[in-house]
Amino acid sequence: MARRIRVPLGFLFAVAYIWLAQPTKTSLIAGTLVLVPGLVLRGLASGHVQKDEQLTTSGPYAYTRNPLYLGSLMLAAGFAIAARSWWIVAVMLLMFAAIYIPVIAGEERSLGQKFPGYDDYARHVPRILPRLTPYGNQDGAYSSALYWQHREYQAGIGCVAMLAVLLIKLVAKLVW
């Protein structure tokens, strides 16, 4: 259920976000400094993961079992900072807890059933916060073809668009 409502809730949240956001020059810069590494992390992760084909333990997956979700959390934190609204922070935390935590748990159950080495991997690699040293061997290489196949570029386009909206809102506030 959480997986199905994720996208529609995201659109509703985007409208509320734009309405409630009160960006400043400082909040936009600080938020961007948090969200850009999240975008990079998502890009690196999507260039390593071979969904449903093999257990991915290379690249960012050697540090955290869920680099895509960690990247998404960093994006959310960056946008919360950029918006300068405690309501947005609270809603983002609630959405993550209500939607992403159950989705992650379900995906991990599925991976445990599908891939024999998953349980050992899960014992050594944290769910979200990364470990300091890589797990296992680093045989898997980054693939730009996977990045494009997974359409991860859409996250970058969305981030640029939302930052542009926040910038327009800031400039409009200064001009009026």
Regions found by a protein language model. Name each.
Residues 1-61, 70-176:
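Membrane-anchoring alpha-helices and their flanking helix-loop junctions
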Residues 66:
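Short, conserved phosphate/pyrophosphate- and ester-handling motifs at nucleotide-, phospho-/glycolipid
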